[in-house]
């Protein structure tokens, strides 16, 4: 019996591109999404046939596209980054913005929480990476010298604690690995022939995957800073994520969502959206009128690896579940 993914349902409330999806580590019935509609939505997962989740709260305050959102490990707070140049920390219970982080001079493209939630890192079009405490104080700015020479599109903490690490991706075509303790550069990973949109670190912190304009995913050994192999996705890559419990890597590309088994390096799933079927299933069936090409821009697994949440350019979150066939 092979394992595959089937469309379980959709979640509709955003009116523009879904830019990021954050899932809780305790697998509770909630997720948080960010969008170009300038809002962040806290969803309650009903897991019903067609409507997989309903919006419980809409968090507003950013004055431009919200580009990224992550959750604190206790699920009480969300952290967002926006094209308005700010980060915001949100109290999800109160539905209010607890803190604003001001310091970047251009759009904030990516944000991340450290494992202990005490440190926050952000990446911006101003070419810098900033390290903050949770009070909103900028503790360090990585700029000039070893820093990226173009927009910093993505930043992630490595989950392995022995050597706390930040990984960043940039439009300068490189991925950089930094020591968190002193913000010093450990490695520059070069190999992409176009801008890099996204970087993901494997659950054990040993691997890093990067992707972007050239449509090729590069896999790197994080400790050694060496390139291991590449996977051809065939079109621009907007998001990457590792499965938490299978040796799988997912890529959101402009043609489909592709999932690789990293052991065999073969594609196990190629998920495409059938708008006609979806419109027939949806109430009103109005999706067929939209002739725009839609594609996935954000991805995240549930903590138990059974559900893949995917956000699209049409503002819809599509939810895929593991099934056997």
From Swiss-Prot:
The keyword Repeat applies. One of its GO terms (molecular function) is translation regulator activity. Keywords: Repeat, Ribonucleoprotein, Ribosomal protein, WD repeat. It comes from the Eukaryota. The keyword Cytoplasm does not apply. Pfam families: WD40. WD repeats lie at residues 13-44, 61-91, 103-133, 147-179, 191-221, 232-261, 291-321. InterPro entries: G-protein_beta_WD-40_rep, RACK1-like, WD40/YVTN_repeat-like_dom_sf, WD40_repeat_CS, WD40_repeat_dom_sf, WD40_rpt. PROSITE patterns: WD_REPEATS_1, WD_REPEATS_2, WD_REPEATS_REGION. One of its GO terms (cellular component) is ribonucleoprotein complex. Belongs to the WD repeat G protein beta family. Ribosomal protein RACK1 subfamily. Plays a role in hormone-mediated cell division. This is Small ribosomal subunit protein RACK1. It comes from Medicago sativa.
């Amino acid at each position: 019996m092979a394992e595959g993914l089937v469309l379980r349902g959709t979640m509709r409330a955003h009116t523009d591109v879904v830019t990021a999806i954050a899932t809780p580590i305790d697998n509770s019935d909630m997720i948080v999404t960010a969008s170009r509609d300038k809002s962040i939505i806290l969803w309650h997962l009903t897991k019903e046939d067609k409507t997989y989740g309903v919006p419980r709260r809409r968090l507003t305050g950013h004055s431009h596209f919200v580009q990224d959102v992550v959750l604190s490990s206790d699920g009480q707070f969300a952290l967002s980054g926006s094209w308005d140049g700010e980060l915001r920390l949100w109290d999800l219970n109160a539905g209010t913005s607890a803190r604003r982080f001001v310091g970047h001079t251009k759009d904030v493209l990516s944000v991340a929480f450290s494992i202990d939630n005490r440190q926050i890192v952000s990446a911006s079009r101003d070419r810098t990476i900033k390290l903050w405490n949770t009070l909103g104080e900028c503790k360090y700015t990585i700029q000039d010298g070893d820093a990226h020479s173009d927009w910093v599109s993505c930043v992630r903490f490595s989950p392995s604690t022995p050597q706390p690490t930040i990984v960043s991706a940039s439009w300068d075509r490189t991925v950089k690995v930094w020591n968190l303790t002193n913000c010093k550069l450990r490695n520059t990973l070069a190999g992409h022939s176009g801008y890099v949109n996204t970087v993901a670190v494997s659950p054990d912190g040993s691997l890093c995957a990067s992707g972007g304009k050239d449509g090729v995913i590069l896999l790197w050994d994080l400790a050694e800073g060496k390139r291991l192999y590449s996977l051809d996705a065939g079109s621009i890559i907007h998001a990457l994520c590792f499965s938490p419990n299978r040796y799988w890597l997912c890529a959101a590309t402009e043609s489909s969502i592709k999932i690789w088994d990293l052991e065999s390096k073969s594609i196990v799933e190629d998920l495409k959206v059938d708008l006609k079927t979806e419109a027939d299933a949806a109430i009103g069936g109005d999706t067929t009128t939209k002739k725009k090409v839609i594609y996935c821009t954000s991805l995240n697994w549930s903590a138990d690896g059974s559900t893949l949440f995917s956000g699209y350019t049409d503002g819809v979150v599509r939810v895929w579940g593991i099934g056997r066939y």
